[in-house]
């Protein structure tokens, strides 16, 4: 159980990193937007789309079902909230707090699932030909998902006896701030 959860939590850390990178690039103020537009506008536009789609894919991945059919009646276990919840339940460790966080994570999934299924993971013909906008949601809903994700990891850590890990902030050497500094001629360009 502990190894499974630690591997799951690493996926959650990666989701946070992807979210932070996208936010730090594209939601950090006009000076940074102008710098991106003056250096490589096409690249940054494409990177924004890639990061959003990848974030949606990862958020759906951790909220997929506990197993996936692979043919001939066989299944593979998924490293997901549902799989961990099932393991916790079997051991009598599934608390109300963990259930509540699971429900919060799955509420967000409902908002983005069509985008994953019809545009990101599959090329749905109707979506491609009619330019249907899928997966739209408020920033507050994305932030709530991340909050549920952190609370879920903390609550599971507690019941299985794993040291909690705060991964709410993922910046460090070589991050977006250093990129903007390099693009800005060596001068630090803080978010606004």
What are these regions (language model features)?
Residues 102-130:
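Histidine-centered, metal-coordinating catalytic motifs and their short helical/loop contexts
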Residues 1-108, 135-192:
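Amphipathic alpha-helical interface segments
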């Amino acid at each position: 159980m502990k190894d499974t959860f630690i591997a799951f939590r690493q996926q959650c850390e990666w989701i946070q990193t992807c979210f932070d990178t996208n936010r730090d690039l594209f939601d950090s103020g006009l000076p940074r937007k102008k710098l991106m537009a003056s250096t490589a506008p096409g690249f940054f536009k494409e990177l924004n789309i890639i990061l959003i789609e990848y974030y949606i894919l990862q958020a759906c991945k951790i909220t997929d079902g506990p197993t996936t059919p692979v043919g001939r009646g066989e299944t593979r276990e998924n490293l997901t909230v549902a799989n961990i919840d099932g393991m916790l339940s079997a051991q009598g460790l599934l608390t109300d707090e963990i259930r509540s966080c699971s429900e919060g994570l799955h509420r967000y999934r409902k908002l983005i699932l069509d985008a994953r299924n019809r545009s990101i993971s599959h090329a749905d013909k109707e979506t491609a030909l009619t330019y249907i906008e899928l997966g739209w949601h408020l920033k507050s809903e994305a932030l709530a998902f991340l909050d549920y994700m952190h609370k879920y990891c903390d609550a599971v850590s507690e019941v299985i006896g794993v040291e909690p890990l705060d991964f709410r902030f993922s910046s460090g050497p070589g991050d977006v701030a250093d990129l903007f500094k390099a693009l800005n001629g060596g001068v630090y360009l803080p978010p606004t």
